[in-house]
Amino acid sequence: MDVEYCEEYRMNSRGVRLFTCRWLPFSCPKALVFLCHGYGMECGNFMRGVGIKLASHGYGVFGIDYEGHGRSSGARCYIKRFDNIIKDCSEYFKSICAQEEYRGKKRFLYGESMGGAVALLTHKKDPGFWDGAVLVAPMFISLLTRVEDVIPKWKIVPTKDVIDSAFKDPVKREKIRGNKLIYQEKPRLKTALELLRTSMNLEDSLNEVTLPFFVLHGEADTVTDPDVSRALYDRASSKDKTIKLYPGMWHGLTSGEPDDNIEIVFSDILSWLDKRSRRWHRQYQIDPAVYSWHG
């Protein structure tokens, strides 16, 4: 593996111990990519392939397990307030950007499934800060029915049935099912309602998305609707926006498809990032003292 991998625990402003990880090229990174994982998922193992792939192509890649997810502390996959996830991600990501060796580097968000919503809301918190986002099968919904009708069949949680329908390759599927850091039970009602509320609010404000983005979706995805990505592309105010739909591919574009398909997806992602990493040296300045964390 031609990249350096590091893990670290950090304490957030609420006193919660959060797991963070990074994949770095041995040369100076050409840009920074910040990972936002899906509901019930985690960065260190599940998103390892993404981290290695991007870092081996020269990007500094940073991930964080949300409170209650993966190796972070907190009630298991209980999301009391989605805003806490956005706050933790924003504070951690900006603490990295404030470090001397990373100042002036382009900064990109990368979100898969629910992580797509995390990435967009992190952008919304400080629209001028981010240089772009890669959104893989993002989660938010068109809601034309009552809450109690939606929650029982809302396929955002990686339970057994969803794992079966999200990850096409049977070997990769079983490996994911065996990852004990992934939450595979049904969500608490409060968590489901919070996710639904967040999705509804995000859907109502898609026109406020202004950063460059690349949204990718498998046309055969039965976990998150490809029409969600089409709606984002159509309604976002971004001047630089790209959509790619992959015929026959499922939800797990970077982790559950046959290797040849995964290579196609990563080739598209890297091409998009490379083009936008070369454009200019960014001028947005931040105060390192504001975004310091306690290890």
Please provide the spans of the model-predicted regions.
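Short beta-strand/loop motif that positions the catalytic acidic residue
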Residues: V209, V215-H217, D221
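Alpha/beta-hydrolase-fold enzymes
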Residues: F108-T191
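Catalytic nucleophile-loop/oxyanion-hole region of alpha/beta-hydrolase
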Residues: E42-N45, G70-K105, D259-I264
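Catalytic active-site module of serine/aspartate enzymes centered on a nucleophile-bearing elbow/loop
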Residues: P247-G295
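N-terminal cap/lid segment of alpha/beta-hydrolase-fold proteins
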Residues: M1-C28
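Conserved alpha/beta-hydrolase
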Residues: G51-G74
